[in-house]
UniProtKB/Swiss-Prot annotation:
Pathway: Amino-acid biosynthesis; L-lysine biosynthesis via DAP pathway; DL-2,6-diaminopimelate from LL-2,6-diaminopimelate: step 1/1. One of its GO terms (molecular function) is diaminopimelate epimerase activity. Substrate binds at residues 13, 70, 80-81, 167, 200, 218-219, 228-229. Belongs to the diaminopimelate epimerase family. The keyword Isomerase applies. One of its GO terms (cellular component) is cytosol. This is Diaminopimelate epimerase.
Length: 284
């Protein structure tokens, strides 16, 4: 059976989007997700992407429901770049029109979004989670109210922090982000037992109080060019530790996100682009 799809990217973090509001794709993906999704996301034998987004009807009075799969078939709670790609898709298909706020249902809860006249997409990412029990992580809360601890990796002792934006994130500060053994550290830390559900891993280099560089190892995907929830988690931790202001530019391999956590309370806001790559038709 042929199905239409569109491929979108947010700072190089790319997704295959299927509108599943009027077909049985949700059931099909749920039943065959592992090999099926890995094949579609394979960059040599499939369409190629970091993940797949299904657009579904919402039962909670939201505009739509977003269901997202990582390239390994796992289902994350939320994805900041993915939700921007979803909004760009809806906007390109003239579904949003004059709406000032677009509520989206996700596995992590209700996410409020908006899009401006320049097609920059702003997302209310909700309040960060810093409780070790709720992230979840075995790291303990430090005096600055951030989960913190050390992890030994061969001859390295890494000082690590944790936060959640509906999904778990480990933050590791480094002096030279290009000088670390990224593949080795990322793959090891993703599966570390300090995080019972595995974790996204972010290596952070502080440029100044308003700018940071982040390199992403995404849970279920490996290296990606950007991670929206990760950028937010990094800003939460850097601002709590006094390393940045409450708003900063987060420079990822795929580009820049603007992240703000006003007064270090309430929701975190993220703003950045999302663009269509191409559309097509595939037998499923």
């Amino acid at each position: 059976m042929k199905n239409n799809f569109s491929k979108y990217q947010g700072l190089g973090n790319d997704f295959i989007i299927f509108d599943a509001r009027s077909n049985n794709l949700d059931h099909l993906f749920s039943k065959n997700k592992d090999n099926f999704i890995e094949h579609l996301c394979n960059r040599n034998f499939g369409i190629g992407a970091d993940g797949i987004i299904l657009i579904l009807e919402s039962n909670n009075k939201c505009f739509v429901r977003m269901k997202i799969y990582n390239s390994d078939g796992s289902e994350p709670e939320m994805c900041g770049n993915g939700i921007r790609c979803l909004i760009a898709f809806l906007n390109d298909n003239n579904e949003i029109n004059e709406l000032s706020e677009i509520p989206i249902e996700t596995k992590a809860g209700l996410i409020l979004t908006s899009i401006d006249c320049n097609e920059n997409i702003k997302v209310n990412m909700g309040e960060p989670i810093l409780s070790p029990l709720d992230i979840p992580t075995k790291l303990l809360m430090n005096s600055l109210k951030v989960p913190n601890g050390v992890i030994t990796l061969k001859d390295q002792i890494l000082n690590v922090y944790a936060a959640s934006m509906g999904n778990p994130h480990m933050i590791v500060f480094v002096n030279d982000i290009e000088g670390i053994p990224f593949q080795e550290w990322g793959s090891f830390l993703e599966k570390h037992n300090t995080f019972p559900n595995d974790t996204n891993v972010h290596f952070v280099e502080i440029i100044d109080k308003s700018n940071i560089k982040v390199k992403v190892w995404e849970r279920g995907c490996g290296p990606t060019l950007a991670c929206g929830t990760g950028a937010c988690a990094c800003l939460v931790v850097t601002s709590k530790l006094g390393k940045t202001l409450n708003n900063a530019n987060v420079y990822l391999p795929g580009g820049k996100l603007e992240v703000e956590w006003p007064n270090q309370s309430g929701p975190v806001f993220m703003q950045g682009p999302a663009l269509k790559v191409f559309s097509g038709e595939i037998d499923i």
